[in-house]
């Protein structure tokens, strides 16, 4: 079974990694789909984000990393996904994600959305929070994979020592 895990991943966090690792164990194959959204100004280019994810997931089998723009359901069909995977940190995530899941189901009736609750130790993480901490020189090595922490430190000229 193939799961499509879409997102901006700007940057990839340990919360994302937790979901990817659990999804591989549950579904066998995971396509991580990096959104190219022209309406946002990301910290990292799509190619950089793909590289970060490939580096962070190199220890896993069954991972593909692709980019997409447009509708998630089109990406899922293109990559022959059986389901769309979404992570939930809090009830506020659920309300938004449920609306999107219903919309996706209206566009592709055979495509299910599966929600995984984020592990408690990562429930506070978001890419926005990580960027904010890094922007002001705080340590992010406990929030993101090692390679991503290095990229963030370079991006924001941070010299904060690792925790």
Swiss-Prot record:
Binding site residues for substrate: 8, 40, 72, 86
Annotated site (Transition state stabilizer): 16
Pfam short name (any one): CTP_transf_like
GO biological process, one term: coenzyme A biosynthetic process
Reaction equations catalysed: (R)-4'-phosphopantetheine + ATP + H(+) = 3'-dephospho-CoA + diphosphate
Cofactors that this protein relies on: Mg(2+)
Domain of life: Bacteria
GO molecular function: ATP binding; pantetheine-phosphate adenylyltransferase activity
Disulfide bonds: none
Biochemical pathway: Cofactor biosynthesis; coenzyme A biosynthesis; CoA from (R)-pantothenate: step 4/5
Amino-acid positions noted as binding ATP in the UniProt annotation, renumbered to this chain: 8-9, 16, 87-89, 97, 122-128
HAMAP family membership: PPAT_bact (MF_00151)
Function: Reversibly transfers an adenylyl group from ATP to 4'-phosphopantetheine, yielding dephospho-CoA (dPCoA) and pyrophosphate.
Subunit structure: Homohexamer.
NCBIfam families documented for this protein: coaD_prev_kdtB, cyt_tran_rel
Protein name per UniProt: Phosphopantetheine adenylyltransferase
Native species: Parasynechococcus marenigrum (strain WH8102)
Higher taxonomy: Bacteria, Bacillati, Cyanobacteriota, Cyanophyceae, Synechococcales
Gene encoding the protein: coaD
């Amino acid at each position: 079974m193939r799961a499509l895990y879409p997102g901006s991943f700007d940057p990839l966090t340990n919360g994302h990694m937790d979901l990817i690792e659990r999804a591989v164990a549950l579904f066998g194959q995971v396509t991580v789909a990096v959104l190219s959204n022209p309406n946002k100004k990301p910290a990292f280019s799509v190619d950089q984000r793909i590289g970060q994810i490939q580096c962070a997931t190199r220890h896993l089998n069954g991972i593909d990393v692709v980019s997409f723009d447009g509708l998630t359901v089109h990406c899922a069909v293109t990559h022959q996904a059986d389901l769309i995977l979404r992570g939930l940190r809090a009830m506020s995530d659920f309300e938004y994600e449920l609306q999107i899941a219903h919309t996706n189901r209206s566009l592709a009736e055979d495509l299910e959305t599966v929600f995984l609750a984020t592990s408690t130790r990562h429930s506070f993480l978001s890419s926005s929070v990580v960027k904010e901490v890094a922007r002001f020189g705080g340590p992010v090595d406990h929030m993101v994979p090692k390679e991503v922490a290095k990229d963030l430190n370079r991006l924001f000229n941070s010299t904060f020592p690792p925790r």
